[in-house]
Amino acid sequence: ILIGPHTSNILSEIILVSVDDNLYRAGYKFIRNIDDYYCVTETYEEAESFIKSLVLELKSYNLSVNQSKTMILNLPLTSESEWVHVLGVPPLVGKFGVVEIQSVKAYLGQALQIMQNNNGDAAPIKYAIKVLKSLNVSKKSKDYIVDTILHWAIIYPYLVPLLQEFIFDCYRVSSDLIREFISILYKDSIIRRNYEGVAYALFFSIKYNIEIESFNMDNLLRGDCICKLLSFLYCKKFGHHDAQNTLKEHAQRLMEFNFNEYWIFIYEILNQEELRGRGLWSNLKNQGISFIKSEYR
């Protein structure tokens, strides 16, 4: 049996050559550098179509794209030192000691342009949000910050991990607005087969006690390990007992054939007896060890 990094590289290349061939046959023009794909398109929609096709091709080999590195962007124009200098100047404070909406609009506009010019790197947006968080902003400014960042997070999914700390909790966003965002994020992520986005939608739903009206278990059995686990925690919280049973049966099947890839999903939802075939894991379960924070179990 061949083992080792060289064998892994060979197998990866064999798989990706097949993926390349199918993408070329579909009419896409791209370059692959080891496992990084670069595709130049004329429109945003064509770029989205390429990403969807790549996701589907990789899925057929039980592989997935790295969502944090997946982005649609313009050519880079601005260096990091330049954007830090630009965003290091905070928006002007108005005569009443608060930052008014006009200044906030201009500041976030700069941050967005810099992000787009720097390979879609979320660092400028995160930096800008931190700066705004430290300022006394007007009510209109706060509403604009929240609405703008939530809108951007749908367009640029790599902003989603910032939302809990820098938007929802920082600005005490209303449950209705969070509910609306979760619904959009969930539906959009399902369409794009972005299971990281689905996982975040489920996490926000659990954390803020907001049920997703369009929740459908059928779409989630194809998700990755974390998506499956959060689906189970969501079903447990909101009393979807049939879906819970479906996921438990799914975990039992995965334990037989694909434990290593889905171990945390399998471990967390099966009991000690059901894990008996996995000695170490059964012992950990017997000791009450969990990898999930108690407030989310």
Predicted regions and their residues:
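Short, low-order "capping/linker" segments at domain edges
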Residues: S79-V93
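Conserved polymerase palm-domain catalytic core
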Residues: I1-N33, Y38-S53, E57, Y61-L63, ...
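Short proline/glycine- and acidic-rich turn/helix-capping motifs at secondary-structure junctions
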Residues: S68-E80
